Regions:
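Unchanged
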Residues: 78-137
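A sequence-level detector of short linear motifs
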Residues: 39, 58-59, 132
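Conserved beta-strand segments that form the floor/walls of ligand-binding pockets within enzyme
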Residues: 30, 45, 58-59, 72, ...
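Residue-level signal for pocket-adjacent positions within structured domains
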Residues: 33, 66-68, 73, 104, ...
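Conserved Nudix-box catalytic region and its N-terminal flanking loop in Nudix hydrolases
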Residues: 51-94
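Acidic, metal-coordinating catalytic segment for phosphate/diphosphate chemistry
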Residues: 2-48
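Nudix hydrolase/Nudix homology domain
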Residues: 1-5, 17, 66-68, 112, ...
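Short connector loops at helix/strand junctions that flank enzyme active sites
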Residues: 26, 41-45, 66-68, 73, ...
Length: 137
């Protein structure tokens, strides 16, 4: 996914231009009017590898891009101000219909040139009925 090209300053609305501020850092958008530096922060996403009561893993089939039609474990973006584990529990409930318990951290993943940092948890299904939402086939 290509990064978004920002053209205007979020502080004053002035024109942005790309500048090299430090030799050891990437070029950054800087406002020509007020000097505000725009830092393009990564998004944080969570995923849960859920063990069901019959020792099977829970997967959902994506109904949206990217990855339409692919089988994945439940996950999604963390909302601003939301605790990471709360986001993992919410995404699991929304995408699978299951209430879960977070059992531990699997790993944290990031890939060069891509925005999301993905935090993956191990979880156990506690209840609910397996069903998908509008993001799942």
């Amino acid at each position: 996914m290509e990064p978004v090209a920002y053209r205007f300053c979020p502080s004053c609305g002035g024109r942005l231009e790309t500048r090299l501020l430090k030799a050891t850092e990437p070029e950054r958008p800087v406002c020509t009017a007020c000097g505000h530096v725009v830092y393009l922060d990564p998004k944080v996403a969570v995923g849960t590898i859920i063990r069901a009561s019959d020792d099977q893993l829970v997967l959902v089939r994506r109904a949206i891009e990217p990855g339409y039609g692919l089988w994945v474990f439940p996950g999604g973006y963390v909302d601003q101000g939301e605790e990471i584990t709360s986001a993992a529990i919410r995404e699991a409930r929304e995408e699978s219909g299951l209430e879960i318990r977070i059992d531990g951290l699997v790993n944290i993943y990031s890939y060069g040139g891509r925005s999301p940092i993905i935090i993956v948890y191990r979880a156990t299904a506690l209840g609910g009925e397996l069903c998908g939402d509008d993001e799942c086939l």
